[in-house]
Structures are given as C-alpha cells and as structure tokens.
Design a protein with these regions (language model features):
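Conserved catalytic segments around the Walker B and adjacent sensor/switch elements
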Residues: 56-64
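Conserved P-loop NTPase motor cores
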Residues: 21, 30-53, 65-69, 78-183
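N-terminal pre-Walker A segment at the start of P-loop NTPase domains
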Residues: 1-22
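Conserved hydrophobic segment flanking the Walker A/P-loop of ABC-type ATPase nucleotide-binding domains
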Residues: 26-27
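Short, surface-exposed beta-edge/turn micro-motifs
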Residues: 58-59, 106, 157, 200-203
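Phosphate-binding and hydrolysis-coupling loops of NTP-dependent motor/remodeling domains
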Residues: 172-174, 178-220
Length: 220
C-alpha cells in the first residue's frame, strides 16, 4: 500500500505482492506487455528482469531510438537483435514466417522509446491479431499518448511506473485506474496517491488475463 502516514490512501484496496506474470499457455499464442513510466522510474530494470525470466527462448528484436543508451548495455541476448529505429517490416516478417510454419517460432518485439509509432498498422496488428500467430510484444513508453486506444485496450499485462507529469498521470488514471479509486476523490488527490504509490521504483501491475491488480517492486 502507499505510505501509511496518510490514512486516506488506505481506502484503495491494492495489495503489495511479489512480481510475477502468470503467462498464458504458449499454445494459445503470444502475450502483450505495456510499461508506462518516466525516465529512471524502473522500466529498464523491469524489462531486463522480464526478458531474463520469461522470454529466454524467444527470437526477436529490441527497437529503440536510444539503443546506445546505458540502459541497454547489459541487455545482450543471443536471439534478440538490437535496432536503432522502429522497423515495422520486421514485425510483418515474423508474422509471415509463423504463418508458413504453423507458429513454430516464439517471436518477441520490444518497442522502447519510439515515440512516433502511435499510428503504425503493424503495431496495431501486433497487439491484436498477431498474438494468435505466436507473436509477443513489450511496449515501453513515457506516456499513454504514444499508444493508440485500440492497442491499449488489448494489452494483457499493464505495468504503471512513476510519472513526473501530472497530465500523464491523470490520463493514466482515467484509462486504467478509475474503477479502483474512491469516487469522492478529486484528481489532485488521485494524482497525489499515484505519485506516492509508484515512488521508490514501485509500480502497479494490472493482469487483464486474470482480472487482478497489485503493487510490486523488483529488487535485483
């Protein structure tokens, strides 16, 4: 829970739990993960942990316009290439390969720090119909405006990290958290709660496959 010094925050029934993704059976297709948070909020640490824990056997590409940044220096995986820009044709190729091989390959596309992908058709397909062809995705962004509403509504796992922009926090609450917060709270109180809840590299994990929400922190 958020800091105990504000008893009002205790009205929000979101428990602290160890981080764990209850991944769907690979036979049913791929999965999708969305991480939303500001720089240095813990997204890169979480991304590396998820890759190490859940995607060791996947083949794919890490797309980032900041691919030379320190955050990616330790993300070296034999089956995951690094690309300094977003290349939608590669995602389409993954789909085509699995279409011709009966979903033989566990493909993964990681899209991090690519602010211009919002209207891309391959990203839309990746988070919707391509999952049925064994394609998984991880999208990392600094605000929800970088992802269109259809993509957002089809994400399996949503991870909400600290945001330093009140407008971004308000939009995040409206999209993902409105049903979890007391109706009597105004947005100043909701924003205050969000900042406190996601401080010190904590984040909220929404599991849309199992209908759960919890607060987590990855300690490495």
């Amino acid at each position: 829970m958020p800091p105990k010094q504000d008893d009002v925050f205790q009205k929000v029934k979101i428990q602290d739990k160890p981080f764990k993704l209850l991944m769907p059976d690979a036979k049913t297709g791929g999965c999708s993960i969305l991480m939303v948070g500001s720089t240095r909020s813990g997204k890169s640490t979480a991304l590396e942990h998820i890759l190490d824990t859940y995607f060791k056997k996947h083949v794919g590409v890490l797309f980032s316009q900041s691919i030379k940044a320190n955050a990616y220096k330790t993300m070296n995986y034999p089956n995951i290439a690094k690309a300094g820009c977003y290349i939608p044709e590669l995602i389409h190729d993954m789909y085509g390969i699995n279409k011709d091989t009966e979903n033989h390959y566990p493909f993964l596309s990681i899209i991090d720090d690519c602010p211009l992908v919002r209207s891309d058709k391959e990203l839309l397909k990746l988070t919707t119909i391509y999952r049925n062809s064994g394609l998984s995705s991880i999208v990392c962004c600094q605000n929800l405006g970088m992802l269109n509403p259809t993509c957002r509504s089809n994400i399996n796992f949503v991870m909400l990290f600290f945001l330093n922009n009140t407008e971004a926090i308000e939009k995040t609450i409206k999209v993902f958290l409105r049903g979890y917060l007391p109706q009597g709270w105004n947005y100043d109180k909701k924003i205050e709660w969000y900042k406190a809840t996601t401080s010190d590299h904590h984040f909220l994990l929404i599991d849309n496959l199992n209908g759960t929400i919890q607060r987590c922190k990855i300690d490495l």
